[in-house]
Amino acid sequence: MILFFLISLFSIPVFAGEIDGKGIICNVYGDTVGYFFESDRAFEYKIAGGDKGLEVVKKDVGKYYTNENSIFINEIKINRKDLKYQKFSSFRGNCKAYDNFNSFKGGFDIEKLIENNKI
């Protein structure tokens, strides 16, 4: 039985590269995090404090994988149909897809994201 399960698990096709040039921006418990896919790798974009104020910071988080239902980035799983974000079993959020880097970059409107901040 275990052998059957292992053979079944490893025969499921997993792909990368098919979403290169596209990105998603997710809202996870009020925080904004984006992932842009290029060269079979995922790059994480977050808003962080810089020298003169908030800025978007890029970090290579490694290879990504896809199947017909999900995108996998390390311990993150994103449903391709409804763009639901899940990290481990507790961190959840919603994402929006972008077809190219310019539209993806435009999704990080820092002024709009902080307009309701009290301090």
Each model region followed by its residue ranges:
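Extended soluble regions of mature proteins
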Residues: 46, 86-87, 112-113
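Contiguous, well-ordered beta-strand patches that form the walls/edges
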Residues: 32, 50-82, 88-101
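Tryptophan-anchored aromatic micro-motifs
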Residues: 18-32, 95
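N-terminal signal peptide c-region/cleavage motif recognized by signal peptidases
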Residues: 11-13
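N-terminal targeting signals for Sec/Tat export/insertion, comprising classic cleavable signal peptides
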Residues: 27-49
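Bacterial N-terminal signal peptides that target proteins for export
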Residues: 1-2
